[in-house]
Amino acid sequence: MQTCYLAVDIGASSGRHIIGTVEHGVMALHEVYRFENRLIEKSGHLCWDMEGLVQNVIEGLKAAHDAGYTPTTVGIDTWAVDFLLLDADGTPIGDPVAYRDGRTAAMREELEPILPFTKLYARTGIQYQSFNTVYQLCALKKEHPEQLAAAEHFLMVPDYLNYRLTGVMANEYTNASTTALVGAISKDWDDEIINRLGLPRKIFGRISTPGTKLGNLSSAVKDYVGFDCAVVLPATHDTGSAFLAVPARDDKAVYLSSGTWSLLGVENKDPITTPASMQANFTNEGGYEYRYRYLKNIMGLWMIQSVRRELGEQTGTRPSFPELIASAQEASSFAGIVSTGDDRFLAPKSMIKEVKAACKDGGKPVPATTGEVMQTIYNSLSHDYQAAIQELQSLTGKEYTSINIVGGGSQDMYLNQMTANATQLPVFAGPTEGTALGNLMVQMIRAGEFKDLADARASIKKSFTILECDPQ
């Protein structure tokens, strides 16, 4: 039987299990399981259904085996910043509150006298986001100090899922770097920051890098799914995995991981933690082989996903993405525009109403139809991509000549064309399953299928269709 590997790729709205194989240097993907991820309201907070996630991860392993696959290894990637605290017995403490919850709204201001953001950025290189792990932990300390007092372990979401599969605890580097508690230079927990914030140092475990074998499936999981395999750490932050799968032609390409979030940037060998970089809110996230993903977080397809969900609730039938794109094309001349980085779009009760209100507040044309709402979102995303690339060129001192888009958003050729037009740069779109591919690439490199990252990236060009949009 052909050797295969399994990527479990979980985003903020859905997860999927994808089998990867490679033959004569050509990779192939086979989706074997898909599930929805959702937020639930609990004790006044927006929380993840963590037990549901664990169950779906395990069910997907079983589905892979039922489909005739026996993976050699499995790797899990998810979104960043969210975490669980565990007690001495390995039992979760409290609820797994999600980054879209509002508990961190005032934390930056409260922490400023203790730890000025200028110092935090200079040490960690991590951009300001209201929901950063550092603010979540401080909000938790304020609301539930007893939970931190009882904690023995801190695990990010993929770390916890790995623990539930193997019984082994580890903090993976790419996700840990997003906490704003890891030194940009040291690549380890920053004791000065942790101590200054009054957080218990003992809960932060040894940091492991992508490619590390964590352990094998526990006996209970193995018996249920019908096989055993090793759990290997990919870049567990989904953006870290997605950036690995960018088949860039040269070092003048901008990377754009397009999903619920749009992460736009480049790979650097060294972090950029200058005051100008801080002012522009660019981040230096840890990557594979200690590369730095120098990028900007942009709201991304979350706004479109929210509009789609809302329309489904109103009518009983969710429109397809092609239908939403077509509605925008019919309103292509509409000039509404908003700032996608505004926190008002993080978790509004109605995205449609919020877009309209933001246009009104900004003195822009207010959309009246679904198509005009969609066109406003497309105008806003393409504008924000263009602005971010201008900032990127200024901060790095380099001129970029193309944009490589990976992830689910790479399928949206209307947005790709608008991005090409706004930036006046050619756009290369694909592969779609960039995150799962990056996850699989780390497993395959570890197994010797590819000699290194350059070899694996060369395989992507041979294995998948990359579409091109030239600026008009």
Where are the regions that the model predicts?
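N-terminal glycine/serine-rich phosphate-binding loop of ATP-dependent small-molecule kinases
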Residues: 1-94, 122, 150, 222-231, ...
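Short glycine-rich phosphate-binding loop at a beta-alpha junction
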Residues: 70-78, 153, 206, 398-407
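Glycine-rich beta-strand-to-loop/alpha-helix junction loops that act as flexible
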Residues: 77-80, 210-211, 258-261, 402-410
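A conserved helix-loop-beta module that forms one wall/lid of the active-site cleft
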Residues: 191, 197-210
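Short acidic-aromatic active-site loops that bind/stabilize oxyanions
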Residues: 46-54, 126, 130, 207-211, ...
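Carbohydrate-associated surface elements
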Residues: 101
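Active-site core segments that coordinate phosphate-bearing ligands/cofactors
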Residues: 6-7, 19-21, 105, 112-124, ...
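Short beta-strand-loop/turn "lid" adjacent to the catalytic site in phosphate-handling enzymes
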Residues: 42, 62-98, 127-133, 162-183, ...
